[in-house]
Regions:
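Conserved ABC transporter NBD signature motif
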Residues: 66-78, 327-341
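Conserved ABC ATPase "signature" region
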Residues: 124-142
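Conserved ABC ATPase signature
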Residues: 146-150, 154
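ABC ATPase C-loop
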Residues: 163-164
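Catalytic Walker B motif of ABC-type/P-loop ATPase nucleotide-binding domains
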Residues: 171-174
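Helix N-cap at the start of a conserved alpha-helix in ABC-type nucleotide-binding domains
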Residues: 182-184
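H-loop/switch region of ABC-family ATPase nucleotide-binding domains
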Residues: 206-207
Length: 341
């Protein structure tokens, strides 16, 4: 069981820390209990204190991040102040928002094996953990790869696999879907379903809510460093969409998004293309048009084209995993040349 008793925390006033509030305190008088085997969603607008609360639950506060900490956090009845980070890591597996911040190796297989190795598992057991995690998360194609060659989404997948390889009783995840596309999120949801079925305790901080629908048993809504709402899954889902929007939350159902056509079927992660796409603000003529430009990247060929108009603002578009979105940004910044077009 996880228990927070009148917890308040403020970072040193030396600058912003991942958007969390510093001047008035990142957390204020947090009191809550999370039962074993429960699935809890932390939600709220950016800067509300979600990330700071996850750092309290996985021991990074007070053992790594400095600040003013009052109250107590208990894991299995033990105060986190009295536990070392190593002891906490045996109980809690963490996945951070930025996967690069938690890598210890330069290749993917070693990264997956890092946790079990440091917990003293025999070599055979370590290999079996890596095999099992790769199978569950569909990471087989990422094994024996350089960390530096991975896309953002691939790095997050390896980070999730590294946490799962430790096989902890508690999982604390801070926006794990932030670098994943819709298909990868669907795969990740399946992993969460398996962990939930195993009776694991899961605490997940997220802006994307739709993939956690019918998974989370409980929702804690945070604002200004406080827990402003404590809902059962049914209570949260029954809130009117307008109310959730007022709370600064994203839709629970992607079909609620206006003007977006969702893809039907799965034809492969690498088959997304952008063609004949135009963008314009209401007060300006067309500022962006995409036809087709081809350039190689990471051993593959990305086919994306772009034509800029005069005095454009900053339009944006999104596409699927390994669609070439990152390559497009690198191309427009001048880091990689076009192959044609």
């Amino acid at each position: 069981m996880i228990a927070c008793r009148d917890v308040s925390f403020s970072y040193p006033a030396s600058g912003p820390v991942d958007g969390e509030c510093l001047t008035e305190g990142a957390l204020k008088h947090i009191t809550c209990t999370i039962e074993d085997g429960s699935f809890v969603l932390l939600c709220g607008a950016s800067g509300c204190g979600k990330t700071t609360l996850t750092r309290l639950l996985n021991g990074l506060i007070p053992h790594y991040h400095e600040g003013t900490f009052t109250g107590s956090v208990y894991l299995g009845g033990k105060d986190t102040r009295d536990l070392s980070l190593f002891e906490i890591s045996q109980m809690v597996g963490s996945v951070f928002q930025n996967p690069r911040s938690q890598f210890f190796n330069v290749d993917t297989t070693s990264e997956l094996a890092f946790g079990p190795e440091n917990h003293g598992l025999p070599e055979k057991a370590v290999r079996e953990r890596v095999r099992l995690v790769a199978e569950q998360l569909r990471l087989e194609s990422l094994l024996d790869r350089s960390i530096f060659s991975l896309s953002g989404g691939e790095k997050q997948k390896i980070a999730c696999g590294s946490a799962a390889a430790i096989d902890p009783d508690i999982y604390v995840l801070d926006e794990p879907s932030s670098n994943l596309d819709a298909y990868a999120i669907a795969d990740f949801r399946k992993l969460l379903m398996r962990l939930k079925a195993q009776g694991k305790t899961i605490v997940i901080s997220e802006h994307r809510l739709y993939y956690l629908r019918d998974l989370a048993d409980r929702v804690l809504y945070m604002k200004d460093g406080e827990i402003r709402g404590d809902y059962t899954a049914a209570e949260f889902q029954s809130l009117p969409a307008e109310r959730r929007e007022q709370m600064g939350l994203r839709p629970l159902d992607l079909n609620d998004l206006k003007g977006i056509a969702l893809p039907h079927g799965r034809t492969g992660d690498s088959e997304w293309k952008i063609r004949q796409f135009s963008f314009a603000y209401k007060h300006q003529p067309e500022t962006l048009h995409i036809d087709e430009v081809e350039f190689p990247f990471c051993g593959a060929t990305a086919i994306i084209g772009i034509t800029e108009r005069e005095n454009p603002p900053c339009p944006a578009a999104c596409a699927g995993w390994k669609s070439g979105a990152a390559a497009l940004c690198r191309n427009r910044a001048g880091f990689i040349p076009e192959k044609s077009g």
